[in-house]
Amino acid sequence: MKITQDVRYIGVSDRNLDLFEGQYKVPDGMAYNSYVILDEKIAVFDTVDKKFGDEWLDNLKNELGGRTPDYLVVLHMEPDHSANIAKFAGVYKDAKIVSSAAAFRMMKAYFGDEFTDRRIVVKEGDKLNLGKHELTFVGAPMVHWPEVIVAYESSEKLLFSADAFGKFGAFDVKADWACEARRYYFGIVGKYGVQAQNLLKKAAALDIEKILPLHGPLLTENLGYYLGLYNTWSSYGIESEGVTIAYTSVYGHTEKAVKLLKEEIEKAGVKVAVHDLARCDESEAVEDAFRYGKLVLATTTYNASIFPFMQNFINALTERNYKNRKIGLIENGSWAPTAAKIMRAAFENSENIEFCPTTVKIVGAVSEENEEQIRSLAKEIIG
C-alpha cells in the first residue's frame, strides 16, 4: 500500500486473535505494522508476528520491484514486531540490521545471535542516509520497553513511532481512534507516563506530518488531536468530566447501592460509567478510571480482605501510577466490614488522591441510612 511515493505499508492484520499479549480482548483483531522506504538505499521498518512471516515477506517482495533491502530498522524488540528478524536476515543476507545496543542484546536472547557482522548500532541523534530520505533516530526507552527507538524522516516529515500512538484493532477497522487507543495506552504503556512525556517533548521539536505506529492506523491529519490526547494520558490528566463506578457484588446488595448512586449522579447531568468487575473487560474499566477524574469503588469484605476482582482492579490502577483523582468508597460486610479501610490503604503511595468524606458502610442490605449516605457521596464525588 502506498503511503507516499517512496514509502509503502507492508504490515499484516490478525483477524482471529482473541487476546493480545495474552490478556487484552481484541474483538476487531490486531494490526502488526511494517513499512519500507524505497530510495537509493532501501530500509524496512520492523517485522511482524511470527505466524505472519511469509505473508509479510511476500508483501515486502511485492514492493521491492526486484531490488533487495539494504537495511532492516528495528525500533522495538517485542516479539509481535521482532519475531521475523532472523527469517529476514536469512532471506536478505547482505542487509544490515539497524537498532539500539539494548535491542541487539535482546536479539541474542531471542535468536542466539547479535548479528555482529552486519549490525549498525544507533543512538539518540544518529542519522542514516538513504538518498533523498534521511532518518534521525530518537531514543524512547520504556515506551514501553527499554530498547525502544523511534525514527524521524525529514524530507517527508514522517515519525515512525514504534508502539507509541498504537491502538487495538486490525489495520483497516473503521472505528473511533480514541477508544481503542486509550485502552491500548493505559493497558500497555500507562505505567510509563514520564517516559511517554519525554518522547512527546522530543517530538515537539520535530516537524511531523504523518505518524506511522506499529499498531493501528496511520495518523495523517489533525495530528494535534492525537498529540493532545497522548499528552493528557501520559501526564495523568483528566480527559473527560465524569464518574467511573467499579464494583463487585455477591448477593446484589452492593449492586443496589451502585444503582442508587448512579441515579443520583445522573440527576446532576454527570456522565457515569459502571463496571461490574466480575463480568466486564477489566481493561475497559481501567480505561474509564483514567479517562474520568472521579472514581467510586464498591465491594464486599472477603476473607478479611476485599473481593478478588476488586483487588485485581486496584492493582491494575496503582501499578499504572494512578494519580490526580477523587475516589469515593462503598463497603459491605455482614459482620465486620473492612473493605473501605483496605481500599483506602491500597492508594497510600499514589499521588494526589482525594477521598470523599462519606464512606457508605453497608451491613448486609442497603438501609435508609445507607441511602442517605449514598446521596451525600453523590454530591461529594461530583463536587
PLM regions: where:
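Metallo-beta-lactamase
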Residues: 2-5, 99-148, 192-198
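Short acidic active-site motifs
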Residues: 84, 281-285
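FMN-binding flavodoxin-like domain, especially the glycine-rich phosphate-binding loop
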Residues: 171-211, 215-218, 260-275, 285-383
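Active-site neighborhood of phospho(di)ester-bond hydrolases with catalytic His/Asp-centered motifs
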Residues: 45-47, 69-77, 97-100, 159-163, ...
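Active-site-proximal loop/helix segment associated with metal-binding centers of metalloenzymes
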Residues: 144, 148, 164-191, 234-239
